[in-house]
């Protein structure tokens, strides 16, 4: 899984934030672009844990070690597929999730944890940029209407299939 010594070879590095005075004037991304080689290095930091506590710390049970490995290897399209295997809305969770997975990261016991949230966001951004992620509206319309009352984001994922009817 990944680079065997990646967690020793690379330090945690986050994409820099845009200046606040610039951000208050627009709705653009908070973080600046991050070069692919740095993203791959962050994916390489993921250790081959016997028990991936990051995965159990994730509310949607993302296959975090798997897609971190795919990032390290530069296999972005497969990473998109792997991410969507457990998460209907990675474009949201990669931005607004408080990332309990990072708090559960085994590397975090002795060093700063893997940049899981940043990696997730960049997988989904790459998927949209490359055209691998596209809307999938239903080809058959019944004419019926569905109302979904959501108390919070946690209820969106199980109801997402209803939105394609």
Describe every region a protein language model picked out.
Residues 141-165:
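N-terminal Rossmann-like FAD-binding beta1-loop-alpha1 element of flavoenzymes
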Residues 1-145:
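Ferredoxin-type iron-sulfur electron-transfer modules and their immediate structural context
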């Amino acid at each position: 899984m990944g680079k065997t010594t990646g967690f020793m070879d690379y330090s945690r590095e986050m994409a820099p934030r845009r200046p606040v005075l610039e951000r208050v004037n627009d709705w653009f991304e908070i973080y600046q672009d991050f070069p692919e080689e740095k993203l791959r290095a962050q994916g390489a930091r993921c250790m081959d844990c016997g028990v991936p506590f990051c995965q159990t710390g994730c509310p949607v049970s993302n296959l975090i070690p798997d897609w971190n490995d795919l990032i390290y290897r530069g296999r972005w399209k497969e990473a998109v597929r792997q991410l969507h295997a457990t998460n209907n809305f990675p474009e949201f969770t990669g931005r607004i999730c408080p990332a309990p997975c990072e708090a559960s990261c085994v590397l975090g016991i002795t060093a700063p944890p893997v940049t899981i949230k940043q990696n997730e966001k960049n997988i989904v951004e790459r998927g949209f940029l490359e055209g691998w992620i596209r809307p999938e509206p239903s080809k058959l319309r019944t004419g019926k209407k569905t109302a979904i009352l959501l108390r919070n984001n946690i209820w969106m994922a199980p109801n997402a299939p209803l939105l394609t009817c």
